[in-house]
Amino acid sequence: MKTPKRIGILTGGGDCPGLNAVIRAVVKTVINDYDIAVVGFLDGFEGLVENKFIKLNSDNVSGILTRGGTILGTSNRADPFRYPILEAGKYVYRDRSDQALKTFEEHGLEALVCIGGDGTMAVSQKISEKSIPIVGIPKTIDNDLFGTDVTFGFDSALTTATEAIDKIHTTAQSHHRVMVIEVMGRYAGWLALCSGIAGGGDIILIHEIPYKIDSICETIKQRKYQGRYFSILVVGEGAKPEGGEMVVKKRVEGSPEPIRLGGISHKVADDIEDKIQVETRVTILGHLLRGGVPSPADRLLATRFGVSAAQQLAKKNFGHMVALRGSNIVTVPIDEVAGKSRTVPLDSPYLSMARSLGTCLGD
C-alpha cells in the first residue's frame, strides 16, 4: 500500500497545553518514518478556507514540546460550512467548504490531521464527506470528548486548578471564609470533580448533579460546629441549582459553541451569604487553566497520540480518531464521536470516592 506523500495539519477550538507536543510528534514521525511532507494550516479551519499556511519540518517543530498554546494558531469560529463573512458592516454566514476542498487540492494533499475537541471532530466528520481524508486527534481541558478515556490538556488544567486550590486553602483558613473556586468544563464535571478531590475541596458542584443551596449551607454550618471555620467549594462553570438554569455569561454569534458559561460561582457565593451570613470570596480560574507548560503526563499522551496518528496516515486508516482506552492507544470512527460528549456518570467511582471522603456534592 502506497503511503501518502503530503499531508496537512490544523488545530481547532480552544487552545490547551500539549497542542505543540502533538504537532511535533506528528511532524517528526511522518518525516522520519515515512518521508511525508507537512503543511500546517493557520488558525484552524480558517487557514484551510483562506489558504493561510506554513510548511512544517523537523527544524521548526524543534523546541516546541514544552511550549503552551499552538504554533499554528486556532479558532472556534471558522466552521467552513457556516463561515463568517463581513458584508455591509455585519457578519453573514456562508458555506465555504468548497473553498476548503480547493485549498486542500491545490496543495496536493492526501490527508488532513485535525486536532481538537467535539466541535472540531464534528466539522472533521462533515468535511471528510467532501473527499478530504481525515485523521483526528482528541484534545480538550474539559475531558468531555466521547470515545477516549482521557484527552491531553486535561492533566495540565487539573494540575493548575489543584495548585490554585492549594493556595486558596491558606487564606480561607486565615480569614475563616468560604472560598468559592470556579473552573471550566462546560457541561462535564470532570475538571471540577477531580480538582476538587485532589485539592481537598469540602463541597464540589458539577453539571451532572443539580445542587441544593440548603444542602451546601448545612455542610458549611456542620463544619463550623466541628471547629472548621472555613470551607473550600469548587464549582464547575456548568453547575446549576435544582430546578434552575446554568449561568450564561454571554452568547457568541457564529461560534459552533455560542453559549459562554461563567459566573455560577458568584450566584453560589451570594446565596450562601444571604442564607447563613458567612463571609464568602470568589475566584474564577478561567483561561488560566488553558495556558502554560503542559504537564509531563500531557506531553507523553500528546506524543503517543501524534505518533499513532502518523501511523494511521501511513496505513490510510482515514475517518478515525486516535484515542486512549485503558493504557492502549486505539482508533475509533470519527462518526461515532462527532456530536457526542462524555460527562461524569452518576455511578462514577470518583463520585463514590468523594462521598466516602465526606465531600458534599450539593444533593
Regions found by a protein language model. Name each.
Residues 21, 29, 35-39, 43-53, ...:
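Nucleotide/pyrophosphate-binding catalytic subdomain
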Residues 138, 196, 286, 309:
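Residue-level signature of catalytic and energy-coupling elements of molecular machines
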Residues 268, 290-301, 308, 312-313:
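Hydrophobic alpha-helical bundle architecture
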Residues 280-289:
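Glycine- and acidic-rich phosphate- and metal-coordinating loops
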